[in-house]
């Protein structure tokens, strides 16, 4: 559905829109940082929407909101001005799922299989996850044909 939406939007506007590659997503999330989260070493439920009943590091337990929030609810943008890169909803990436990065493109291009692999990468974690699943480096996968209330997407505009 997400790839089809990007194709539709591209045809409608005459500009190329697509899902980000996994490498692009992580670059956008980190925004030049090297910490687990773009806002630092740890996370609290004051900074993102995740299952706050789980601890991360030395932080106390937080709130479990049980629903998605509107974009920008926490008003914690990264250095690129992007909101909600951690938690709220998993975000689809263009790449197919691979267990590791062996033989992955080293230039940021998408990594697609020639097989029937329809399992795609998701990044960012969601409201249902503990904080460790919301780190900049965390990754998950699902069949692209499946839909969930805790999965969304953000699109890339190609220049």
Protein language model regions, located:
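Functional-site microenvironments in short loops/helix caps that host divalent-cation chemistry
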Residues: 1-138, 147
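Short, structured beta-strand segments at or near domain termini in extracellular proteins/domains
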Residues: 149-159
């Amino acid at each position: 559905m997400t790839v089809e939406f990007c194709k539709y939007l591209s045809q409608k506007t005459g500009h190329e829109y697509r899902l980000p590659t996994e490498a692009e997503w992580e670059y956008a999330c980190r925004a030049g940082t090297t910490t687990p989260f773009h806002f630092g070493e740890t996370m609290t439920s004051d900074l993102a929407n995740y299952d706050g009943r789980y601890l991360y590091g030395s932080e106390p337990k937080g709130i479990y909101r049980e629903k998605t929030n509107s974009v920008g609810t926490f008003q914690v943008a990264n250095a690129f001005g992007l909101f909600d890169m951690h938690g709220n909803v998993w975000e689809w990436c263009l790449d197919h799922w691979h267990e590791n990065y062996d033989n992955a493109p080293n230039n940021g291009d998408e990594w697609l299989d020639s097989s029937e692999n329809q399992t795609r990468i998701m990044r960012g974690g969601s409201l249902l996850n503990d904080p460790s699943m919301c780190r900049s480096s965390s990754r998950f996968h699902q069949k692209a044909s499946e839909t969930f209330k805790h999965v969304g997407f953000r699109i890339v505009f190609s220049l």
